[in-house]
Amino acid sequence: MTGETRKERSKWDTKGPPDIVEISEDESLPMNMDDHKKGNDDHRKGSDLLPSQDFGHGNDKQIGESLNLKSTVSMHHGSAGHEQDRADGLNKDIKERSSKASSERLPLRMGDEDHNKNDWHNRGFEKAAGNQGMSRYADDRRRGDGWGTTLSRGYSSRISSSGPDAWKRSRSPLSPRGGWNRSRRNRSRSRSRSRSIGRGRGRSRSRSRSPYFSDRGSEWRVERSRSSGGPALPCRDFVAGRCRRGSNCRFPHEDGVRRQFDEHYPVDSREKYGHQNRDFMDPREQDDYLRNRPPRGGHYDEGTWERSEPRREYRSTMPCHDFVKGRCSRGANCRYVHDDSTPHGGWRDEVRDNAIGRSGPDSSYGNRTEHRRTNKNPCKFFANGGCRRGQNCPYLHEEASQSQMGLGAPDEPGYTGGPTTRGDYLSWSEQNNSVQASSHVLSRDDRENPVPQGTGRNDSRYENKNRHSKDAGSSQYQIFPQDDFGSVGQNKPEIAASQLPQFIPSVQTGTESINIDKVSDMGGQSGPGTVGNLSMQIGMHSANLLGGHNLGQKAESQDAISQISAAPSLPGATQLQNTTSSVPLNSQVQQSDFSLHPNRQDQFAVPHATTNNSAPSMQSQPVAPYMGHSQHGYIMGAQSLPDLSVHNGQIFNVGQVPQNLPTIVHAGQNQATSDTPNLGRDSGDQGLQNTHNFQPVAPNEQTQSQTLQGLSVVASSSSVDMAGAPLSHNAVSSQEEVRRVTASLAQYFVPSLTADTSGLQSSQPDPNSSLMNNSSAAPQAVQPNHWPWLQQAGMVQPSHIVPPEQPAPQTFQAPMAAGSSNGNPLLLPHSVAPTVPAAALATNETTPAENKKEEPKDTDAEANEDGENKKSKDSKALKMFKLALADFVKDALKPTWKEGQMSREVHKTIVKKVVDKVTTTVENTPQTKEKIDIYMSYSREKLNKLVQAYVGKYAKKD
């Protein structure tokens, strides 16, 4: 029997692989059940035989089962040799198994359970004699060390699949562990032959009670895989959210959720290639969609997916781009850094900016992350007060100072109406109690469309001037460098400290407009001129600072000033006893500190400065009226100011401050004529005068008067840095030099001059101020229209006087013109007009100048030629002006003409009368079409009144 048993064993050794397949198969249960019945019948027939015979019957049953399985498999593949390869390849499918669809795993698990119930228990108890087959299967499970289970499960999954495709998928080995499993299986099979029958029976019985798909959890599989030396791979299906095995899954589930974030993101194609590809699609967008999409299996919120704290070894230092975009749903479980300060690409800034632009600064997206401003340019929307981005705006939200904004502030959009500066400044209303006056600045580009610019806005320069006027002493003449507003009283000589009469510059026109006049750019021969920002504070006690002292010269950085051709400018040559002041400016403008020294107890003499000639172009801007602390911002041309108490005898007492400041005082060889604009033509108020109205605030105190000549008052709102200039007595009164200078100036100012005017028509001076001239009994005045550049010894005419009690608007004129004396260009400053009521303006407009003196003596032939050219140009300009007036009068007469209330002759008469009246009154004819349009726009009301007056006069006669 032993020989037969060995023979039978050696006989079935060649068919060993079918034994393994027979025990592992899942879907061959009907065939196995038939074989079980047949085996049971054989077992009942041979029940009285020996145990060896029983073993033989068990082998017969095994042979039947093997033959049945072999025949079944042979129908598909044809030979048992292929079955051996297929069985070997099943061990190699451990890595393919986890990536299969979930539809293959559910039947697998159910098939395994049926296999455990039917096959294992039935065979374990019905075939007690078949211990060899059981021992072989037990040996396979024991020597698998975790991999035998894979063999059984993998084979079962292939059998559960339909057709030979499942076998074909398992043909190609993907892992080098196949040969290792095959060698271990062969050694285990050889060892199983030498084991005893009882041991095999007991082992098979014990194994049958605990099938390989027990509910012992996944820990034992992890331990077995680690003990066998294999890596503990995470469950990919659990990471993808579709693992249905739960605790029975052989792969670990802990921290598997973090595996999907281990891969580094690819380089953004937008950052790599720019925006060249229109069909750009960010691969991270697809990852975000897959990452944030809930899985179909419903395991998104199960178990370890909602872990509150991820493992620290999976933490990455890379920023979470989902959090930057504002859509990271992982919260604290995200392994990437949730930090707003981490650097990121520029396209994320675009996403953020676009989102902020759509939703506004108060949205949750805008508040979630803090935007970093890397751009140093100011935000123009913030200057207008309408930036919707708020703190997320990449541009600076700090209002730039006017020096940074440049000189063309009126032309820059958004400069007015914006928020005030953030500095700790005092408001004008608290410091000065001044009346807020709005003004219009007319530049070359927007003369027809004036930009309203409030003078009451908080400007750092003006506020600092007001604040420094209190600190620097109340009785002194000071010059504040425009770059030294932060330091008070630096390089400013204090003359005395006491209460002072406060002078108020009148700054407003009848039409609330400030005209920036023409500046001619001339080539100069000598050094740069000096322009000072004169802050006038007159006190009782003052030190006697003689002319010629350098008072706080401070050279500052020099800014180029753009030349502006704006409102028309008219020459006003006021030459007192053949003395003129040259007020030169170079492209390098400097600022100087001036101080007035007392001449005697009741008088102040303005020390003069020796200056060099240059060719500037300068822009003037409005200066707010300072009514509280008498801190006046002027730009005083660093002029050659002679002591007029000696040369001209012009003395201004305290109660009698000069109305008409002489605009020209000559020093040395430099003679010039000042270019005074015609406010009547530019703003429609012909009666506005170019005079400075000083109103003393404390007239009862013992004060001193000053001798002022050649003081040019210019608005100091431009960002011009100026340096100091020495003050010295250099007065020259030469009749010959005056004639030569006036002749040479004609060639530059022919378009803006008229040959038939030589006197000065005075405006309404302040009764509190009078000009005492030793050489002429009449006080000086400035004519609003043309005034002659040929005047050599000025006899000035008095004019209407308006009491200061009338709250009339005031004008601030900023005209400039450049002249030349022997090739030396000169900057001619302006004066400021007083407040004049509308009635006085209308009267002064229609009233011709009285007692006008002419100085026609000019021996230069060059002047005569220039006069002829001037007349020809004036005739063309006058013709254009008359045509414009005629059109205007015709439009005004249309309603009356259509109603038939006047005849054709009356219509023509009215048109002719109005045109003649205006042209004879307005001697300074506008030269260009733009200037004519400006005049017509500002003079519309007055012209209408004049037309209606003639209509009432001539229509009644008909």
Swiss-Prot record:
Q: Which residues form a coiled coil?
A: none
Annotated Pfam families: zf-CCCH, zf-CCCH_2, zf-CCCH_4
State the source organism's domain of life. Eukaryota
Zinc finger regions, C3H1-type: 229-256, 314-341, 373-400
* Bias (Basic and acidic residues) ranges: 1-16, 33-47, 80-126, 216-226, 273-291, 298-311, 346-355, 458-471, 850-860
GO molecular function terms attached to this record: DNA binding; zinc ion binding
Q: Note the SS bond partners.
A: none
Q: Which UniProt keywords apply?
A: DNA-binding, Metal-binding, Repeat, Zinc, Zinc-finger
Basic residues bias spans: 182-208
- Bias kind Polar residues: ranges: 428-441, 686-707, 756-778, 808-824
Q: Does the keyword Repeat apply?
A: yes
Compositional bias, Low complexity, is annotated for 152-163, 832-843
Q: Does the keyword Hydrolase apply?
A: no
Q: Which SUPFAM superfamilies does its entry note?
A: CCCH zinc finger (SSF90229)
Region (Disordered) location: 1-235, 273-311, 346-378, 403-491, 670-707, 756-781, 799-873
User: What name is this protein filed under?
Assistant: Zinc finger CCCH domain-containing protein 55
* Species of the source: Oryza sativa subsp. japonica
